[in-house]
Amino acid sequence: MNERYTFSGHESFYCKSLWLKKGYDFVKSDKNFNAEDAVVYLGVGKNMVSAIRYWLRAFGMLEEGNPTEIADFLFDNKNGKDPYIEDLGTLWLLHYYLVKTEVASIYKLFFSDFHKEKNNEFTREQLQHFLKRKNAETGYNNLYNENTIKRDIGVLLQNYVMPKRDRPNEDFAALLLNLSLIRQSEDDNKTLYFNMNGKNELVPEIFLYAVIDDKKEEMIVPFDRLMDLALIFCLSKSELVDTVLLFVEKYPQQLRYTDDGGIKQLFFLKDFNKNEVLKNYYKKR
């Protein structure tokens, strides 16, 4: 059997803007999500308590009940770089972690595999069929539940698609809305798009962080590998090249980009610590 996908767990709640910080502080205070007073401390209902824990795990902020290194880096009350998520770069970083961790399988499948297959235009129904097919390929057919997948799709879209302006303010509280990565057609309610042209500007350092994180120990990254990452950030091929050239210019001692006879590659000339990239970015804020 192949990789086993996981769906549901969010209790049908998208991730609200302050939930990660609220959940992080809760865990750092040695509180227990299963305790009766969790609803009092967090100020939400029981299902939302479960949802907050789920999103902490899905965004890679919590592992085995403990805050991760990146969670401390961002949210620590004393030294956290962006505890209240005021910087656009933090949103891009959290988006990357949501896709990367695969606690919520739908995000990697959607932004990587489905995006590559469908190009930029899609419907909910097409995404549903795609997820059913991908799940069947794993051999775990008995784990597929149509209603569960529909709820996952609905929550994913709530996380990323800006609601119509006649909706309640509560609908505008999703953490990742400001990235504008997905948009809905103005002509109908069915067609959706990966917002390649209208998304918010990607912070180059966050993409570089993702490249270093993804490449592991490799010192040469082929262009196809970069394009796979670019899909996650809804970057076009030309935007990808521009972004790579930006950070190659900034770090000439560590990086070189070549295009020899159409073979494009990014070379790492020496070891490059991804955490130093983040520290340099947040230092200039």
Predicted features, each with a name:
Residues 1-285:
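Donor-sugar nucleotide-binding helix/loop cap in glycosyltransferases
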